[in-house]
């Protein structure tokens, strides 16, 4: 426990806040254009081909974004909406594409958790 004199000299240090999604610039989502759509493999204990795309945002940032859900219609020059949210087993992937908005189609035949994948209510 510091003395009053030590606190007068030094003061308490504020914890440094590190922004986890700097490219969004305090916005909930950002629009961008796909520059490359490809698959990549996850870190050690997991095994899959994860669908990701490199996106050039409207503010000039170039980020890697994960495409969730089964199947997608994205290709180069597709306009996508990006939200925050990292993928734990893909290093460098700190953003998600929003399904069902702009050029990104919703997931077909999705019955549960539809709002997360831009799927309409089945008849």
Swiss-Prot record:
- Say yes or no: keyword Ribosomal protein present: yes
SUPFAM superfamilies given in the database record: Nucleic acid-binding proteins (SSF50249)
Q: PROSITE patterns per the record?
A: RIBOSOMAL_S12
Q: Which residues form a coiled coil?
A: none
Q: Keyword RNA-binding on this protein?
A: yes
Report keywords, A-Z.
Ribonucleoprotein, Ribosomal protein, RNA-binding, rRNA-binding, tRNA-binding
Cite a single Pfam family from the UniProt record: Ribosom_S12_S23
- Annotated GO CC locations: ribosome; small ribosomal subunit
Molecular function terms in GO for this entry? rRNA binding; structural constituent of ribosome; tRNA binding
Q: Where is composition skewed (Basic residues) in this entry? A: 113-123
A single GO BP annotation from the record?
translation
Annotated stretches, region: Disordered = 104-123
Assembly behavior: Part of the 30S ribosomal subunit. Contacts proteins S8 and S17. May interact with IF1 in the 30S initiation complex.
Q: Which HAMAP family match?
A: Ribosomal_uS12_B
Q: NCBIfam families, per this entry?
A: rpsL_bact (TIGR00981)
What family is this protein classified in? Belongs to the universal ribosomal protein uS12 family.
Please describe what this protein does: With S4 and S5 plays an important role in translational accuracy. Interacts with and stabilizes bases of the 16S rRNA that are involved in tRNA selection in the A site and with the mRNA backbone. Located at the interface of the 30S and 50S subunits, it traverses the body of the 30S subunit contacting proteins on the other side and probably holding the rRNA structure together. The combined cluster of proteins S8, S12 and S17 appears to hold together the shoulder and platform of the 30S subunit.
Query: What is the name listed in the Swiss-Prot or TrEMBL entry for this protein?
Result: Small ribosomal subunit protein uS12
Question: Source taxonomy lineage?
Answer: Bacteria, Pseudomonadati, Pseudomonadota, Betaproteobacteria, Neisseriales
């Amino acid at each position: 426990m510091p003395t009053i004199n030590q606190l007068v000299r030094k003061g308490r240090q504020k914890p440094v806040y590190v922004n986890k999604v700097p490219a969004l610039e305090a916005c909930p989502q950002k629009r961008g254009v796909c520059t490359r759509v490809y698959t990549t493999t996850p870190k050690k204990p997991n095994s899959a081909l994860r669908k990701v795309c490199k996106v050039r945002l409207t503010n000039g940032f170039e980020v890697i974004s994960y495409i969730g859900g089964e199947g997608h219609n994205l290709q180069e020059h597709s306009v996508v909406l990006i939200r925050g949210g990292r993928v734990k087993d893909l290093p460098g992937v700190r953003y998600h594409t929003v399904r069902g908005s702009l050029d990104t189609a919703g997931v077909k035949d999705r019955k549960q958790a539809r709002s997360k994948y831009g799927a309409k209510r089945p008849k």
